[in-house]
Amino acid sequence: MKNISDYRNKKVLVLGLAKSGVNAARLLHKLGALVTVNDKQQFDDNKDAQELLADGMRVITGRHPVELLDEHFELMVKNPGIPYSNPMVKRAEALHMPIITEPELAYQVSEAQWIGITGTNGKTTTTTLIGLMLNQQRPHHAFDAGNIGIPVSQVAQKVGKDDTIVAELSSFQLCGIKTLHPHIAVLTNIYEAHLDWHGNRANYVAAKMRITMNQTPDDYFIMNWDLPEMHELAKQSKAQIVPFSRKNAEGARAQLIDGWLTFDGDRIMKASEMQIPGLHNIENALAAIAAVKLEGVGDDAIREVLRTFSGVKHRIQYLETIDGRRVYNDSKATNVEAATVALNAFDQPIVWLAGGLDRGLPMDALTPLVKKHVKSMVVFGQTAPLMAKIAKDAGVPVQTTENVMTAVPLAYEVSRPGDVILLSPAAASWDQYPNFEVRGDDFIKAVNQLKATVESGDK
């Protein structure tokens, strides 16, 4: 880790905890900063706050008191989920206080080279593939971190200058970067998402494009050339554009050609040899291939990873086969586009579990997909009425239930051997769960309970 003296005795406010806030606070404390942590959750129920207090940091919980900013903090490290419309954040902006997110802090103290990955869908899988491929061959280590679940500030404290940080970066995180400069940036795709947080699509796209704002002509920006919008967005970057395409777009360096994954025209392997299903995963693989080829990784390492990698938890993750039904957990599908990808990934009849936070977005584009792929639906959460209407319009039976735990046995009852039982909510989890991981873990728990019941002969 760099020897950073800029933070010594600096008054820093960490706004919001969770994993990123906790690790940012610990890193700042280690660097000698005077850290105050403010989290909305009450202290008695806030294990993170209790541990930080025990470590010697000042902790204020239960609310976000705007008057706290009268103490003249020199920096705010904001939890990425807290919007800029929050009164504390707006007051900090009015005071011209620098506001950053945790990845920016990590970048400032890290000696490693960075590869940054963003996009509406496919970020985690692409990040994971890049890390696995780099570690398959190189003598130095690649560390996956960021929105993938491991805070970058945690990794930044142990990487060396010859290592690589492979960082999944959300639009929320990118809004708070200042100097973060990935040598290779990847933009997997852009669809409608998080418009409630960003206000409009233009702001969302601008947030995604911040991943390339500090790049130079010596850097690389990998983009999905199958999306016409990318061709215009590419003009905003100073980096060398490296396009990838599943549909033979002109100028793409990583392409699917006649069923083969290729780079600069050279065949690497047949896409059919990949362990993970779906056309979307071919796109993720092409993006990863482009990134690691720029780093000199050979075809053998790429083939080994793509032939063995079975998927990321909560992303069309295969769980079990129960009495002939294959069960998949796609809790990460927090929007219509991600659920569309999941529904298109299977040829078998699907019993679809869906529902979650209602962001007020149109969902009727799902109707023809339901008609084509789905035999029955089980819906829950705020969007349950919307999803039930989609089922009705598609002529598909539907049941409404409380949550994913109660949905699983209902899905089993209406399924038959040879079917797929798929959780792919098409909505965020925040109406019932703190995040999609907890929702997915509940689904896994319910599936395990169902399996035990079926195998005991009680079903």
Swiss-Prot record:
Sample GO molecular function, one term: ATP binding
GO biological process: cell division; cell wall organization; peptidoglycan biosynthetic process; regulation of cell shape
Keyword Lyase set for record: no
Cellular-component GO terms for this entry: cytoplasm
Pathway(s) this gene product operates in, as recorded in its UniProt entry: Cell wall biogenesis; peptidoglycan biosynthesis
Top-level EC class as recorded in UniProt: ligase
Reactions performed catalytically: UDP-N-acetyl-alpha-D-muramoyl-L-alanine + D-glutamate + ATP = UDP-N-acetyl-alpha-D-muramoyl-L-alanyl-D-glutamate + ADP + phosphate + H(+)
Pfam families in the record: Mur_ligase_C, Mur_ligase_M, MurD-like_N
EC number: 6.3.2.9
Keywords from the UniProt entry: ATP-binding, Cell cycle, Cell division, Cell shape, Cell wall biogenesis/degradation, Cytoplasm, Ligase, Nucleotide-binding, Peptidoglycan synthesis
Main location: cytoplasm
UniProt subcellular location: Cytoplasm
rRNA-binding in keyword set: no
InterPro entries recorded: Mur-like_cat_sf, Mur_ligase_C, Mur_ligase_C_dom_sf, Mur_ligase_cen, MurD
Binding annotation for ATP: 119-125
Gene3D superfamilies the UniProt entry points to: Mur ligase, C-terminal domain, Mur-like, catalytic domain, NAD(P)-binding Rossmann-like Domain
Function: Cell wall formation. Catalyzes the addition of glutamate to the nucleotide precursor UDP-N-acetylmuramoyl-L-alanine (UMA).
Protein's recorded name: UDP-N-acetylmuramoylalanine--D-glutamate ligase
Organism: Lacticaseibacillus paracasei (strain ATCC 334 / BCRC 17002 / CCUG 31169 / CIP 107868 / KCTC 3260 / NRRL B-441)
